[in-house]
Amino acid sequence: MAEITASLVKELRERTGAGMMDCKKALTEANGDIELAIENMRKSGAIKAAKKAGNVAADGVIKTKIDGNVAFILEVNCQTDFVAKDAGFQAFADKVLDAAVAGKITDVEVLKAQFEEERVALVAKIGENINIRRVASLEGDVLGSYQHGARIGVLVAAKGADEELVKQLAMHVAASKPEFVKPEDVSVDVVEKEYQVQLDIAMQSGKPKEIAEKMVEGRMKKFTGEVSLTGQPFVMEPSKSVGQLLKEHNADVTGFIRFEVGEGIEKVETDFAAEVAAMSKQS
């Protein structure tokens, strides 16, 4: 067995753009023969995947699944909505979700490692960067999920509620984007930041500080209601709040998770001509 030196790994990295561990693995399998390693990497799609790794993957799908008293939600990204609808991409996302559920995996790095070879092969086949972005789970007495197309997914956990109510609550979360369950759950740093913003606005209107502070106190109560699930008007019956709805059913929400495809990812905008030019350079 030939010695796989750091300089050999470095050279392969420079020539292929692949990751260090991928290069070391390829060299080991090729017994230190760098040309054979490159040939094998080309066949496996590793080089193509490495070249695509820098491309922003901000499209994709959200998948949800309930397994007993635990529900899982997963986001897998690609670069375009066209690929997001591809059967192979969808099957890959389903397989990753099934593995997360079966193994109770909530560490995305574990999933990434488990499916790296399949991801690389799919990148080579489809021609876009693919990323297993995030996974989460939620436990509860009664669980519900809702998916708005493939782009928004919601899990809701409740007690004292039936499945229909939990489904409606999940639909509400999808539409209204609450950040917390109850107004009292709003974190101190969020409250303080909003308080300062509102105080500055009130002071700029020329109000004395004492009056401005009283105005802001009223606004803050409204703010914590707006960002919390129970404080929001129920989307299916806006005359009542979600909190009032839950009280009528003697139910309580213990948690929720909302994923939306690409949220927080800065997508690079390119015009059609630039996109065609970029594609011609790659071919």
UniProtKB/Swiss-Prot annotation:
Highest taxon listed in the record's lineage: Bacteria
GO MF terms here are:
translation elongation factor activity
| Pfam families, sorted | EF_TS
The protein's location, in the record's own words, is: Cytoplasm
Which Gene3D superfamilies does the protein's record reference?
1.10.286.20, DNA helicase RuvA subunit, C-terminal domain (1.10.8.10), Elongation factor Ts, dimerisation domain (3.30.479.20)
Keywords carried by this UniProt record: Cytoplasm, Elongation factor, Protein biosynthesis
Q: Does the keyword Protein biosynthesis apply?
A: yes
Specify where the region named Involved in Mg(2+) ion dislocation from EF-Tu lies, as residue ranges.
80-83
What SUPFAM superfamilies does the record tag this protein with? Elongation factor Ts (EF-Ts), dimerisation domain, UBA-like
Q: Name one GO cellular component term.
A: cytoplasm
Name the HAMAP family on file.
EF_Ts (MF_00050)
Family designation? Belongs to the EF-Ts family.
Q: What does this protein do?
A: Associates with the EF-Tu.GDP complex and induces the exchange of GDP to GTP. It remains bound to the aminoacyl-tRNA.EF-Tu.GTP complex up to the GTP hydrolysis stage on the ribosome.
Q: Which protein are we looking at?
A: Elongation factor Ts
